[in-house]
């Protein structure tokens, strides 16, 4: 039986489905509800911030493994909580988009009341766990949650083309959370990590908006490609990627030449692909290339920050 055809209560009471199948189906719905992809990608930058703080403060990971677990689990729960509330709020527009129409809030697998309760409870537990690391980590997590749920989901998503930029605040917080769990003091490394994530998100999500332009238009969401067109969006993507160019050099004294060179090559490669958009007519195909590169960019850049701090590079 397809997941769309039943609610959570019906699944539990269905004797024709094995317990193993029920667990698989339930897990699938939970992953969709918490947006597991968003949670995982944000944890990459959280872990990077945490491990770099360990390195720069000459701390021991083994003596901080408990703090690490609290940081990762707490951050994951706060992010998941924000995504759950986002799903609850967007239940009226999600049916209009193919990538969101099968979310459990839309299909009715979970009741909206239970979704909201679960989202707020998950957030609260996450913040509580982070309090055992540091108040700064907790504050950064709350700012990220507030930015995503209130500033983006509720206030700007359905009103302004700048919704992407506004929402970028939340996605830039995880490296600060990871760092602050170990060290509350200001340092150039987490600040630049914040800037990288803040800037990176706009070309990433504008590329997605180009790919799904028709769906956003049908849902009434004023994404830049819908309101201003593809040409303007392409130019905006170029501008934001160009803004990434100077950032690796701010880390040259702390991260070394290897990181600066590789990060710059990534930036130049992404920028070169972006410029080709000015000369191609297949906008969605180009946007998909930009989108895929942005994912690889993140997967390469943040682990690279950790790798270059290994003794072999000292």
Swiss-Prot record:
Name the Enzyme Commission number(s) assigned to this protein.
2.5.1.141
State where the protein is found: Cell membrane
Q: Name any Gene Ontology BP term.
A: heme O biosynthetic process
User: Per its record, how is this protein called by name?
Assistant: Protoheme IX farnesyltransferase
- What assembly does the database describe for this protein? Interacts with CtaA.
Q: Where are the transmembrane segments?
A: 36-56, 65-85, 114-134, 135-155, 179-199, 237-257, 259-279, 290-310
- Which family is annotated? Belongs to the UbiA prenyltransferase family. Protoheme IX farnesyltransferase subfamily.
Please name the PANTHER family in this protein's record.
PROTOHEME IX FARNESYLTRANSFERASE, MITOCHONDRIAL (PTHR43448:SF2)
Keyword Transferase applies: yes
Q: What does this protein do?
A: Converts heme B (protoheme IX) to heme O by substitution of the vinyl group on carbon 2 of heme B porphyrin ring with a hydroxyethyl farnesyl side group.
Additional note from the record: Carbon 2 of the heme B porphyrin ring is defined according to the Fischer nomenclature.
């Amino acid at each position: 039986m397809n997941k769309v055809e039943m609610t959570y209560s019906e699944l539990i009471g269905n004797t024709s489905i094995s317990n193993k199948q029920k667990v698989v189906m339930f897990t699938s719905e939970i992953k969709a509800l918490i947006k597991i992809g968003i949670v995982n990608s944000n944890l990459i930058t959280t872990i990077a911030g945490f491990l770099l703080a360990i390195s720069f403060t000459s701390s021991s990971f083994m003596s901080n493994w408990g703090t690490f677990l609290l940081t990762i689990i707490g951050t994951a729960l706060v992010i998941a909580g924000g995504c759950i509330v986002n799903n609850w709020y967007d239940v009226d527009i999600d049916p209009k988009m193919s990538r969101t129409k099968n979310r459990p809030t839309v299909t009715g697998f979970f009741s909206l009341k239970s979704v909201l309760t679960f989202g707020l409870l998950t957030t609260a537990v996450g913040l509580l766990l982070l309090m055992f690391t540091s108040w700064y980590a907790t504050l950064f997590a709350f700012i990220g949650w507030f930015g995503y749920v209130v500033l983006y989901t509720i206030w700007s998503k359905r009103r302004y083309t700048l919704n992407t930029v506004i929402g970028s605040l939340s996605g830039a917080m995880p490296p600060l959370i990871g760092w602050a769990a170990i060290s509350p003091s200001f340092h150039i490394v987490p600040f630049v990590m914040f800037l990288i994530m803040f800037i990176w998100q706009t070309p990433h999500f504008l590329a997605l908006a180009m790919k799904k332009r028709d769906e956003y238009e049908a849902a009434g969401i004023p994404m830049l490609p819908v309101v201003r067109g593809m040409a303007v969006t392409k130019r905006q993507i170029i501008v934001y990627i160009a803004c990434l160019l100077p950032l690796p050099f701010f880390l040259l004294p702390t991260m070394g030449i290897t990181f600066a060179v590789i990060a710059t090559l990534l930036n130049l490669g992404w920028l070169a692909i972006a410029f080709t958009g000015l000369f191609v007519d297949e906008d969605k195909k180009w946007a998909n290339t930009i989108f895929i590169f942005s994912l690889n960019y993140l997967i390469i850049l943040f682990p690279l920050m950790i790798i270059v701090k290994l003794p072999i590079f000292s």
